């Protein structure tokens, strides 16, 4: 094994270690590894994407945005970078801008349930309700046990007054995650609205 292969293997091992730390919720520990990788190579796209993802999980949006912007500047094929930028714009309720970036992420990485979930919600929130619901349904078809998707789709159906469908989605989310406060509140909202409509 030559020096470049050994170096590449070391980088991959550290990226994998950072990924495992991220998945176990140890974002700050993951960031230490990733930041060291970026000191060694400021153009390491994978490390930039992972920094952005960890910062997003910690709700440090400015830092996540900076890392994601750097990733897409260096690599226009960074679907993770475009997804994170779109997610942040959604969080700021800049729906049309979010839709553009999330569509770009979806184009680069089709059929990714999380990208589709965020794109669907941004479409729905931007006034493209039918397309938003269809996109959320696609996300749910890809990942049928995701409480976030179930709740987002349920809220969309609630807003178009399809209470039966909304309630079923929220109850499914509660089956999967009984402590899900959002789903509990949404079930209560459906019940209140159903009673109000019946008079």
For each feature predicted by the language model, list its residue ranges:
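Helix-start (N-cap) detector for alpha-helical repeat units in TPR-like alpha-solenoids
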Residues: 11, 45-46, 79-80, 113-114, ...
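Structural signature of tandem alpha-helical TPR/SEL1-like repeats
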Residues: 23-32, 58-70, 91-104, 125-138, ...
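TPR-adjacent "capping" and linker segments in tetratricopeptide-repeat scaffold/adaptor proteins
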Residues: 1-13, 197-198
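Alpha-helical segment of the N-proximal tetratricopeptide repeat
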Residues: 9-46, 50-60, 91
């Amino acid at each position: 094994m030559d020096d470049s292969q050994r170096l590449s293997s070391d980088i991959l091992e550290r990226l994998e270690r950072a990924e495992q730390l991220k998945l176990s919720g140890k974002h700050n520990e993951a960031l230490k590894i990733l930041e060291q990788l970026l000191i060694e190579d400021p153009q390491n796209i994978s490390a930039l994407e992972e920094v952005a993802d960890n910062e997003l999980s910690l709700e440090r949006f400015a830092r996540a945005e900076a890392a994601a912007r750097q990733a897409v500047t260096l690599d226009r094929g960074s679907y993770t970078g475009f997804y994170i930028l779109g997610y942040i714009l959604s969080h700021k309720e800049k729906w049309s801008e979010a839709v553009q970036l999330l569509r770009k992420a979806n184009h680069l990485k089709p059929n990714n349930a999380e990208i589709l979930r965020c794109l669907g919600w941004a479409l729905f929130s931007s006034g493209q309700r039918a397309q938003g619901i269809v996109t959320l349904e696609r996300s749910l078809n890809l990942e049928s046990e995701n409480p976030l998707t179930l709740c987002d789709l349920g809220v969309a159906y609630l807003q178009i007054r399809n209470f039966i469908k909304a309630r079923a989605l929220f109850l499914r989310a509660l089956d999967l995650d009984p402590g899900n406060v959002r789903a509990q509140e949404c079930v209560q909202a459906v019940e209140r609205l159903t009673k109000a409509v019946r008079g």
